[in-house]
Amino acid sequence: VTEVHRYTGFAALAASAPEDALYTACEANETAWAMAVRLEGFAPAEYRSIQDLRQLSEAERSPRRLEIAAAAAHHGLRFFADDELVSVGSGRGCKVWAVHSLPDPSTIDWEHVHDIPVALITGTNGKTTTVRMLSAIAAAAGLMAGNTSTDGVQLGGDMILEGDYTGGEGARVLLRDARVDIAFLEVARGGMLRRGLPVETADAAYVTNIGTDHLGEYGIDTLDRLAEVKLLVAKATAAAGTLVLNGDDARLAPALSAKRSVAVLVDPQELPAHGFVRHRGRLGPVNDSRFVAWLEQADIPATLGGAAVHNIYNALGAMAVAVQLGIERGAVVEGLSTFASDSHTNPGRCNLFDLCGLRVIVDYAHNPEGLEVILQTVAALRPQRTLVVIGQAGDRDDASIDALADTCVAHAPDYVIVKTMEKYSRGRDATEVSQRILQRLRDGGLPDEHLASAPDEIAAVHDALEWGREGDLLLLLSQADRNAVLQLLESLRATAWQPGSALPCERTEGLK
């Protein structure tokens, strides 16, 4: 199969190939493009010769690998392969071999190979928090849970790999670990577009929401197209799994017509026939239009007493997925009510610090929708004054940067510090994005005396803490130096630092 997808300003060529010829096919694709470019009179980039492609094909060829893949499919089991390892089954039921010592499929003890429950979590915002809520629920059920996220691969309470592992590599590492009883995989847009789904089958999948982030990349330039990408997880649940969707998201609601789909809703005007909802401040399932309250929103620390509505959605999604995976009510309630969502269990995701009356929230919000929900949370907490530290990476287009600034303006904070994110400039001048945000804030009506800039995140946080007083709330949008920011705040809380007093660090330093 060969397909051409045309987008604004570019095109993508896709071709199918056997399992043991995919890398060669990709290189052949590049070579074909380079030759076409040369025929048009342009100088192509470096590419492989036909002889190189033949050698690559021979090196990649592995009939035994294909035989094992076919046998795994016959037994209804997951199959993973990469440059070094081949495996069948998953978690505690996994068998793994080096690519150069693959067994005859007939010699594999298939009775002792099995799969573990796997859920996929995707969407624009809320993915990482949801997989961590699910891991807490599974732990309460006595299961060894593993998860992948933008922070790494986590098993139980231990981070076994650090970095962005929201693609296939993280899934393979986790699902080849024989200690894992159940797995929750954060699935990012980029990974799906580059490599596809990390697993072919999943027992459940949850799509949190659709928002304006990374538009313009890989030909995805509208929210409807982005929704199509996020809903690719439905392919993994099509055979026997359950698709959980945010039913309040207009771009996801139509997909609820699919078989075995479940909606999560916050304060619906009418109870659905089935689903998981917040109703009168309580969370629980709805069956045959009858609501059963499992716990109060105030009993879920991540919701900050109900102020953090986005975490109510995350909790409902986690609840729905857990139930689909067969986890009992008691474990769901215990997991959600004991998940602190603090700087240790969920770093950088709506972490609230109380510094002797000065409240500080550290959050990863980096798109307009994420900023909107965290600013709504701030408003619900009713501070005397509000300060926002804001910045953005350089790979967002101008419209997305402007929208982030406009969202901030709409909530009329008392003070805004715009940070420069030099190591995330990604092709722009170091201060280009911060200067654009500052100007957009001015254009939106924020006076100069309510605005400031800082050369980096640490300096911005230092200035924010010097500004804050008892009764205020500081919203620190932290990406570049999150760990240092959290360490500083933990130290200030532990030493009962008083707002208005000297800080234990210089403006350009982290914690001493």
PLM regions and their residue ranges:
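Adenine nucleotide phosphate-binding catalytic loops in nucleotide-utilizing enzymes
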Residues: 220-227, 231, 260-372
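Preference for protein termini
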Residues: 1-117
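Walker A (P-loop) phosphate-binding motif
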Residues: 107-151
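A short, gly/pro- and small-residue-rich
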Residues: 199-210, 225-231, 262-268, 438-439, ...
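A short helix->loop->beta-strand "cap" motif at the edges of active sites that frequently abuts
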Residues: 237-242, 259-262, 413, 448-449
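Residue-level signal for inorganic ion chemistry
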Residues: 72, 148, 186, 208, ...
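ATP-dependent carboxylate-amine ligase
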Residues: 308, 320-330, 334-512
